[in-house]
């Protein structure tokens, strides 16, 4: 699919039409004062796995890079969208080379990320910490912020200390700009805490730590 939508592909014009809709939406995001709202834009995520049509095994590194670069340049230069921060977020990787295999270039990425979930086969407090330590030097080399762009434990009904004993350990000593846990659909599919859940009090303890800043703790970030 990627080869068909990048420049020269038979579906390239159709892809441009999709991007026109993306651009219209992004440009509609304004404050009451008329200022554009900044957006963390994370296209083609988890590409180191094969679960998506843009993932490894479904396209080459060259095709992926061409897709990323065209997308950014079209939105920025053709459509005038300047309120996006582009986030590069592979899935679990085995090495720094693996992480950078599909790297579109320093000029095409604003934030480096990682998507990794806590599972029975992949413990976040041990495997996650090792992976974070493995990757933490790349943001310094690229002079860009690093974030935990997707994580969580799905439907946590038993681990009351998950935030302080699992997630906190995974990011210990790692200068992550932000952590994003996935959505809460309902009580049968959730990743974040909610009133009455088993980890509610532990989450409050977690966010009270010195490493964590919530929206209420931050002022003037757009100045």
Give the residues covered by each predicted segment:
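Substrate-binding cleft of extracellular glycoside hydrolase catalytic domains
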Residues: 1-77, 81-83
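Aromatic- and acid-rich polysaccharide-binding/catalytic face
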Residues: 99-125, 182
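Aromatic-lined carbohydrate-recognition surfaces of secreted/lumenal glycan-active proteins
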Residues: 42-44, 68-97, 144-156, 181-184
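Alpha-helical scaffolding within the catalytic cores
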Residues: 24, 90-104, 126-138, 161-170
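Loop/turn elements at helix/coil->beta-strand transitions in domains of secreted/extracellular proteins
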Residues: 31-40, 79-86, 107-111, 141-147, ...
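Chitinase-like catalytic core of GlcNAc-active glycosidases
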Residues: 51-54, 65, 93, 108, ...
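Substrate-binding cleft of secreted/luminal carbohydrate-active enzymes
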Residues: 144-223
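Extracytoplasmic/secreted cell-surface and envelope-processing proteins
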Residues: 50-53, 95-99, 120-124, 155-160, ...
